C-alpha cells in the first residue's frame, strides 16, 4: 500500500512540475530560425531523415535565416569476430558535417557523430532491415541535435 501511495505521489509531482521535452511540438515555435536552402551530400537514408525533420523550419521567415550545406557519412565496422573469423559484433557510425551559411558566408561549422553497437544476425534480410532502422534512428538523433544547435546560434 505504501508503495502505491509513493508511486502516486511521484507521478503527480512529475506531471505538475511542467516538464516538457526540449524538442516537443509545443517548443518548436520557440525556435526563431528559418532555413532558406538545404544542400545535401552523402548517405541517402540519413539525408532523407534529416530533411524530413528540418522541413518544418523551411517556410518560416524569422530574423535568423540560414542556408545549410550538409554532408553525411555512414560506416559499418566489425568490432568482434568468432574463432572462425566470422563477424559477431558490429558498430554503425554516422557522422554529419554541417556548414551554416548566413548571406553566403560561413557562420558556423558543426560536426555530429553518433554510433550504435549491435550483434550479427544469421538472417541477413533481418540484419539489413535492422541496420536501416539503426541508420534512421542515428539520423533522427543528429537532426534533433542540429535543430537545437541552430536555435542557439547567435
Report residues per predicted region:
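Short beta-strands and strand-coil junctions in structured, solvent-facing domains, enriched
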Residues: 22, 77-78, 153
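Sec-dependent bacterial lipoprotein signal peptides
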Residues: 1-17
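Acidic/histidine-rich, surface-exposed loop or edge segments in extracytoplasmic proteins
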Residues: 29-40, 123
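Conserved acidic
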Residues: 42, 46, 88, 130, ...
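Bacterial Sec signal peptide processing site at the extreme N-terminus
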Residues: 14-34
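Surface-exposed short loop/turn segments
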Residues: 52, 61-133, 144
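N-terminal secretory signal peptides
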Residues: 38-63
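Short, well-ordered alpha-helical segments
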Residues: 129-154
Amino acid at each position: 500500500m505504501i508503495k502505491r501511495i509513493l508511486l502516486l505521489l511521484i507521478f503527480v509531482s512529475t506531471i505538475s512540475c511542467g516538464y516538457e521535452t526540449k524538442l516537443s511540438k509545443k517548443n518548436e515555435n520557440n525556435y526563431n530560425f528559418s532555413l532558406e536552402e538545404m544542400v545535401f551530400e552523402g548517405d541517402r537514408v540519413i539525408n532523407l531523415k534529416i530533411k524530413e525533420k528540418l522541413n518544418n523550419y523551411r517556410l518560416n521567415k524569422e530574423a535568423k535565416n540560414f542556408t545549410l550545406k550538409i554532408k553525411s557519412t555512414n560506416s559499418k565496422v566489425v568490432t568482434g569476430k568468432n574463432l572462425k573469423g566470422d563477424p559477431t559484433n558490429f558498430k554503425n557510425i554516422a557522422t554529419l558535417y554541417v556548414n551554416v551559411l548566413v548571406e553566403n558566408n560561413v557562420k558556423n561549422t558543426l560536426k555530429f557523430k553518433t554510433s550504435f553497437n549491435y550483434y550479427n544476425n544469421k538472417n541477413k534480410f533481418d540484419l539489413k532491415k535492422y541496420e536501416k532502422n539503426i541508420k534512421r534512428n542515428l539520423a533522427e538523433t543528429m537532426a534533433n541535435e542540429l535543430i537545437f544547435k541552430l536555435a542557439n546560434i547567435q
